[in-house]
């Protein structure tokens, strides 16, 4: 694997003091804006995870769990004064916080914050093992995920846990424990969907034990869901929650919300009129929404397929890692609705990309990849979601989407021009 220190001067031994300064600066920022607020408040998605687990331990009827009004009433009954909902989570999400249900909401949040800190350290260690980077470089790399990491702490989210599952699964593969890797990805996919794309990546590389074990894990969790929650709840989830979610439609949330930073939201703003949310689209042509999504999806899929074909045609020594990298980045680019903490998951594919490409002469492309990754982490410090846009100004409303597009393009370009891919 390429030495990360040679790729970016910041990570050279000559810049050790600068690395230490960056580590202290990013750590202090994360603690002040993320960890301390997490310790002192119960907000955003944590109540949704916690209350769903409490309902499970209390034997509540889960048939109403996707009724936002009913779920909000349960949140208030537990002394939490905020709006919440269980949608769009799969039923299995209720299992995650079961160990914390004996505690009060604030105590449970504090315990989960400590767990997240431990998970951050574990992810740094796994990243170092996978990439061969120094520990301080791995730590800085994860801290550069910025607001995504901070909001994972603040909101009591699960994405450090999911990143841990993904990194550990890849580590298992490198240790030739493919079945364990698949089982981990399957368990992760039962709660959050992204790990499914990595199961597909292993299947493309004919690493059959990993996707087979992953699918068994998914089917096993699904069977448990049906037994515990009932088939009606699962059918409702599939038809009324999952399918609308894949189209960027989430209950009690505006489908035009700029905060989603997705192609779905962008094309809605450009093409689809709405009296309240989008009275004057750039081009009033409702069919353009579907056509635009189809074109982008086909382009991303085509370029991803081309990059993977090239890796396999030239028998690239790191084709599995680079396949997973490009699939992961493509999946993040096409997500129908995103939040800051989702982009913690970018750490895995971007780290694979940077550490496994062989041509050390492509400094500018590598710098662009790392720069895009860091910019995605901090771009939401700009309050672009609060501004009003009209006409062509709507193009300025989606900076994270454009940064993701740049990252994807740089990844494709770098793989295409990797001069040491024929070995």
Give the positions of each predicted feature.
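Short, intrinsically disordered terminal tails adjacent to the first/last structured region
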Residues: 1-11, 414-423
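Primarily membrane-embedded glycan-assembly and transfer machineries that use lipid-linked glycans
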Residues: 2-180, 205-327, 332-333, 339-340
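Aromatic-enriched
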Residues: 28, 352-423
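Hydrophobic transmembrane alpha-helices
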Residues: 104, 192-195, 349
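Transmembrane alpha-helices and membrane-interface helical segments
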Residues: 122-126, 164-175, 201-206, 210, ...
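A cytosolic-side transmembrane-helix exit/cap motif
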Residues: 159-162, 182-185, 232-241, 363-370, ...
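Membrane-interface alpha helices of multi-pass inner-membrane proteins
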Residues: 179-203, 327-334
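Hydrophobic/aromatic-rich transmembrane helices and adjacent perimembrane loops
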Residues: 339-354, 399
